[in-house]
């Protein structure tokens, strides 16, 4: 299954409700419990400068893009065993598509 086309506004609401307590998206945004996500697309796992990643995250070696984020966001601990991201995931494909659409627009 491909990544469903997402709605940026719905994705923003999901980000605010489920992600913003640990992540920022703006250029120059600070790291919180999780890394700043600016420049996420096209970056390899564990590469945000100044953030202390687990070895598992650094070693995963995939590049963040629509399809890898779609799989990761369903169940982060299954996709990267040993990640410190304490998020159960988004089980609904349309919600993951919405969040990815928002992240693509907000992290450029």
Curated annotation (Swiss-Prot):
GO MF, one annotated term: heme binding
The keyword Iron is annotated on this UniProt entry: yes
UniProt modification remark: Binds 1 heme c group covalently per subunit.
Gene3D superfamilies, per database record: Cytochrome c-like domain (1.10.760.10)
Transmembrane regions: none
Compartmental location: Mitochondrion intermembrane space
Pfam families, alphabetized: Cytochrom_C
Function field: Electron carrier protein. The oxidized form of the cytochrome c heme group can accept an electron from the heme group of the cytochrome c1 subunit of cytochrome reductase. Cytochrome c then transfers this electron to the cytochrome oxidase complex, the final protein carrier in the mitochondrial electron-transport chain.
Protein name, entry field: Cytochrome c
Species: Haematobia irritans (Horn fly)
Lineage of the species this protein comes from: Eukaryota, Metazoa, Ecdysozoa, Arthropoda, Hexapoda
